[in-house]
């Protein structure tokens, strides 16, 4: 059975990791993609990971397509510039930052840049009809309404969350960071004792999990309700 893990060498170079579960793509002649997840960053390769920021992935691609696909997508950012651009609001993959298919499983059989020169590497666990993933032209943006709901502060910014200046998040955030630290061999950001979980009306369902090695235990983050787009 082929190795399905993201290479440790790549994870050790990551300045940011976005986890976007159950990205849905329904296509017939035109393919549209949408999903919500989280992004954590670090200042250096030996620094602890920041608290997670909620993000949204959107995009579309022309082509003769038919079928429906749901994928769990992981984006590995290999430069500080890429995560700094994300803090500004959004980036377009392939335009604002170079993106390449990550070397794992079927994704490693073609189009793989083993020198890790791209700014972002994309991974997908796919259960539908499409054999692969192309993210060029997709937009990943900060989900302002979800961050407000999760952190309980109106207008909380990505910069505040990344720098530890936002309110203490629910306990699920710390468990996510513990799994992320295990996957990338770093320490977890020291933070105050987590506050009580947010009411179910604000965070009803699991939304994201860290990208551990195959078969590792995961801890989902609670998903805030998403309001109108504020990009």
Question: At which residue positions do the language-model features occur?
Answer:
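Small-residue-enriched, tightly packed secondary-structure blocks
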Residues: 1-231
């Amino acid at each position: 059975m082929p190795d399905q893990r993201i290479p440790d060498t790549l994870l050790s170079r990551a300045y940011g990791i976005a986890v976007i579960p159950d990205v849905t793509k329904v296509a017939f002649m035109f393919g549209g993609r949408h999903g919500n997840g989280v992004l954590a960053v670090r200042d250096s390769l030996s620094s602890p990971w920041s608290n997670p920021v909620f993000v949204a992935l959107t995009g579309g691609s022309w082509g003769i397509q038919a079928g429906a696909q749901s994928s769990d997508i992981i984006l590995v950012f290999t430069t500080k510039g890429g995560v700094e651009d994300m803090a500004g609001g959004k980036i377009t993959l392939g335009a604002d930052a170079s993106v390449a298919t990550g070397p794992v499983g079927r994704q490693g059989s073609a189009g793989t840049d083993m020198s890790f020169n791209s700014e972002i590497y994309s991974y997908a666990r796919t259960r539908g009809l499409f054999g692969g993933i192309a993210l060029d032209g997709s937009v990943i943006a900060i989900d302002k309404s979800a961050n407000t709901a999760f952190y309980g502060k109106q207008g909380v910014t990505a910069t505040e969350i990344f720098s530890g200046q936002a309110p203490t998040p629910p306990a699920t955030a710390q468990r996510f960071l513990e799994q992320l630290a295990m996957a990338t061999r770093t320490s977890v950001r020291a933070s105050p004792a987590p506050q009580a979980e947010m009411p179910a009306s604000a965070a009803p369902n699991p939304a994201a999990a860290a990208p551990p090695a195959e078969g590792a235990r995961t801890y989902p983050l609670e998903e805030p309700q998403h309001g109108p787009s504020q990009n």
